[in-house]
Amino acid sequence: MALYEHVFLARQDVTSQQVESMIEAYKGVIESNGGKVEKTEMWGVKSLAYRIKKNRKAHFTLLNIDAPPAALAEMERQMRISEDILRFLTIRVDALEGEPSAMMQKRDRDERKDRERGRRRDDDGYVGERNEEG
């Protein structure tokens, strides 16, 4: 079977739970066609460089997939039909990475720096001073 990295962007107005249910549905498609999803990473809501289907932000998600091409084609077909998916990209790779992706490493690094500086970061990326009172 072939190895793939698949990233998809879901509309900003869907909830994180809905994104998780989409991930589970797409995992089911892959597994029912003889493949498996090795790793899933939700990168959160990020700003887009330009508007896509009238959206300025999107939920970014990465899937590392080990599946036959037919399974991937079926998953992509279902993503094309879904109105909640803005874009997706699938790349065939020689080997899947076991460690966190660069996006997750960046998030961890940013959170660590904010803790050291006494700041907090919310889901939208806003950085504000930590409130010590409560």
Swiss-Prot record:
GO terms for biological process: translation. Pfam families: Ribosomal_S6 (PF01250). Residues 105-134 have a biased composition (Basic and acidic residues). GO terms for cellular component: cytosolic small ribosomal subunit. Keywords: Ribonucleoprotein, Ribosomal protein, RNA-binding, rRNA-binding. CDD domains: bS6. Residues 99-134 are annotated as: Disordered. InterPro entries: Ribosomal_bS6, Ribosomal_bS6_sf, Ribosomal_S6_plastid/chlpt, Transl_elong_EF1B/ribsomal_bS6. One of its GO terms (molecular function) is small ribosomal subunit rRNA binding. It comes from the Bacteria. HAMAP family: Ribosomal_bS6. Binds together with bS18 to 16S ribosomal RNA. Belongs to the bacterial ribosomal protein bS6 family. This is Small ribosomal subunit protein bS6. It comes from Methylobacterium sp. (strain 4-46). The lineage of its organism: Bacteria, Pseudomonadati, Pseudomonadota, Alphaproteobacteria, Hyphomicrobiales.
